[in-house]
Amino acid sequence: MLKIVLIVGVLLFNLVGVQAHEKEMDSLDNLVKKFEANPADPKTTIQLLRELKNQGKPNRDVVNRYFQTQKETDYLKDYNWSIIRDYVDDVNAPQIKYLFNNQSKFMQNYSKDDVFQKLDNVFVGHLEQYYAN
C-alpha cells in the first residue's frame, strides 16, 4: 500500500512539474507575441526581459529592438532607466554611452549610487572578458 501511495505521489509531482513548465513556456510565448506586436511598450518589454532572465535566456535582441523605438532623450524616463539599469550590459550599447555622457542628468533623476553602480558593473563586466582569457 505504501508503495502505491509513493508511486502516485511521484506521478502527481511530475505531472505538476510538467504543467508548471508548460505554463512558463506559454507565458514566455505570449509575452514574445505581445512584444512583437508592439515593441515600443515598456511594460511588456520589462515583463519579457524579466521572464527571459528568470529562464536564463539571452535578452540582447529584445533590448536592441525596444530601444530602436525610443529617442535618446527618452532614455531618462523611469521605465527606460529601469531597463538600462537591469538589462543593458554591453559597454558599447548606445544606452550605456548615453548614460556615461549624461551622468549628471541621470543623477538629477536617480540616485548617484545607482548611476555609478551601473557604469561600474558594465565596465567591470567588460574588463573581465580580458582576464578570463
Short names for language-model regions:
Residues 21, 26-133:
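Non-catalytic all-alpha helical scaffold/repeat segments
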Residues 1-22:
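Classical Sec-dependent N-terminal signal peptides that target proteins to the secretory pathway
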